[in-house]
Amino acid sequence: MPLKSIWAQNTPYSKFLLGVGVILISAVAFTLLSTVVVTGLYGIPMYQLENMLQDVKNPLTLQLLKVIQTGSTIGTFIVPAWVLAYLFHGDPKEYLQLRKLAPAKSLLWVGLGMLTAVPLINLLGDLNSKMHLPSFLAPVEQWMRDSEDKAAVLTEAFLDMPDPGALLFNLFMIALLPAIGEEWLFRGVVQRLFSEWSGKKQVGIWAAALLFSAMHLQFYGFVPRLLLGALLGYLLLWSGSIWLPMLAHFLNNAAAVIAAYLYQHQLISANPDTLGLGPEQFMVLLASIVLTALFFVLGKRNAQSV
């Protein structure tokens, strides 16, 4: 009996455990492979690589990290999602809901909704960053802060884009690859497994969103990422096409990358990270909430009309 037929009949629980194993093996394999690739391409001995990767201000280090990050994303999300879809169904395109295209109008409305949501996302992130754990968990909170600070240093280094070439590569690495891989894995596989396991699609959406947010290990952005994950799950539920959450995910990440590039090169005066924050931007925030809600309602209606 073909391997895919065996796993197609297994319980969601056993499928989930298999999924964890496939993800871990693939992530480690591709990270190691990309590490070997950079040592070969750049002629750097393996024993020197670890020390080099600590200096994120070094342009060569950034190139190495971007290659490794690209390989890691492919190995952690894209490859496991495709493999698991094959094992669980046999037709990955059907299982991941890639065959059905979302209506053009729903793509338009959802795209506009993601762009107008930026101030609202900034507010949620700001509120999340001000949350504190109880005093007895102070060591945990300090660890979370330290982890967040380290991640922020790397993110800031990645977003340093001196030329259009760096912008294009970041759009590929930060926007396109995650939009494909994370949606295939979390919405295409994980959400489906938890929906089958619980018998409730709502449980699948929120369980996948919870894991999606936790996976990023950025604790002070947990709430907005959780809500974003849930929204992406509902987009899949409403449309039956993974192309809609993929577009929304891409635009969310791409907007941040493009805004950072424009701000760095003084092509826009407003800092995109503070848009919607502060009492003087109340009207901007209000407009963001109203327009985002309106666009997503229109997107939902058009997605469900097909």
Question: What are these language model-derived features?
Answer:
Residues 6-27, 97-116:
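Alpha-helical transmembrane segments and their helix-start/interface "positive-inside/aromatic belt" motifs
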